[in-house]
Curated annotation (Swiss-Prot):
BP GO terms, sorted: translation
Family: Belongs to the universal ribosomal protein uS12 family.
Lineage: Bacteria, Pseudomonadati, Pseudomonadota, Gammaproteobacteria, Vibrionales
Protein name according to UniProt: Small ribosomal subunit protein uS12
Keyword Plastid: no
Molecular functions (GO terms): rRNA binding; structural constituent of ribosome; tRNA binding
Amino acid sequence: MATINQLVRKPRVKQVVKSNVPALAACPQKRGVCTRVYTTTPKKPNSALRKVCRVRLTNGFEVTSYIGGEGHNLQEHSVVLIRGGRVKDLPGVRYHTVRGALDCAGVNGRKKGRSKYGVKRPKS
């Protein structure tokens, strides 16, 4: 334990908290333009073709963003909204595209968990 005199001479250093989503710059979401839309394979125990896109954000960052849900309508030059949230089995993918916002359409035929995929309530 440090004495009061030692703390007066050299105070304790505050720990700096590093952000998991630096490209968002303390914003909840950011807008960007798709520069490349492609599929990639996940890490070892899993196997799939995960849909991802490279996005150039309005603040100049270029990030990789995951496209959730079954099927999508994104192409190069599509304007998308991205949010934070990593994909555990895709290294380097720390962002998700927001479905149902800007050029990214919601998921067709989605009945459950609709709010996460930009789907309006179905007519009953």
